[in-house]
């Protein structure tokens, strides 16, 4: 990503290489008033020519940083220190700044806003403005969404062995004990996970439940675990 700096100010951002014109000034043409004042200035004829230098897009790849700077093109250094996980935070747009010393252009995010842990509902004002019905869900909260994901995972895990339960309920072979134990363990684990989610004090605590870390921080080959835990292994 690059910025065009003119008169110590950023005038344009380039997200990708593109053909550019530096120092562009549009051509001007004589008007009827010009012609009335001087008959030699015929309306519609060229008054001042177009100005500027055209450059092909490949200069962004072929030129050195110094060569690009010489025509006002600066490579942008992005500061991601305020960038948060978009699953849990609403990030700001990037603010670009030209720094006269040391003659660089940087881009930085502002302070991210944590998303709501609970459902956000439409208000009476929202309803009067035609945005939605008061009391209905406007935006799903992080906790309800996470718990929904957990319950869906539990449903998917149990689904493949539901036929064992149905067969037993209709007078067929009893469900093998290891499967009965496992299915109960899945439901118990789902409830435990949902309780952990409910108990998260804030967004960072919620995110931490799902974050995997090495059991030995100094050994990147060591197993990874997360506070939320894992589903029980299915019987073989």
Residue ranges of predicted features:
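Short, charged, amphipathic alpha-helical segments
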Residues: 176-184, 207-209
């Amino acid at each position: 990503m690059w910025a065009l700096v003119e008169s110590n100010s950023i005038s344009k951002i380039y997200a990708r290489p593109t053909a550019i014109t530096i120092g562009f000034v549009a051509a001007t043409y004589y008007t009827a008033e010009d012609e009335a004042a001087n008959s030699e200035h015929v309306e519609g004829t060229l008054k001042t020519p177009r100005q500027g230098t055209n450059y092909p897009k490949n200069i962004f790849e072929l030129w050195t940083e110094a060569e690009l700077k010489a025509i006002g093109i600066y490579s942008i250094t992005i500061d991601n220190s305020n960038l948060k996980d978009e699953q849990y935070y609403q990030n700001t747009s990037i603010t670009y700044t030209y720094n006269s010393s040391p003659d660089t252009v940087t881009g930085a995010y502002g302070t991210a806003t944590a998303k709501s842990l609970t459902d956000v509902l439409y208000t009476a004002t929202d309803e009067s403005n035609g945005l939605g019905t008061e009391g209905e869900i406007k935006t799903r909260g992080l906790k309800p969404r996470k718990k929904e994901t957990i319950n869906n995972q539990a449903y998917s895990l149990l689904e493949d062995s539901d036929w064992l339960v149905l067969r037993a309920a209709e007078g067929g072979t009893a469900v093998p004990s290891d499967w009965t134990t496992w299915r109960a363990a899945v439901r118990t684990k789902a409830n435990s996970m949902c309780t952990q989610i409910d108990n998260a004090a804030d967004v960072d605590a919620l995110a931490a439940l799902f974050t995997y870390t090495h059991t030995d921080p100094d050994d990147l080959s060591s197993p990874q675990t997360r506070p939320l835990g894992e589903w029980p292994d299915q019987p073989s």
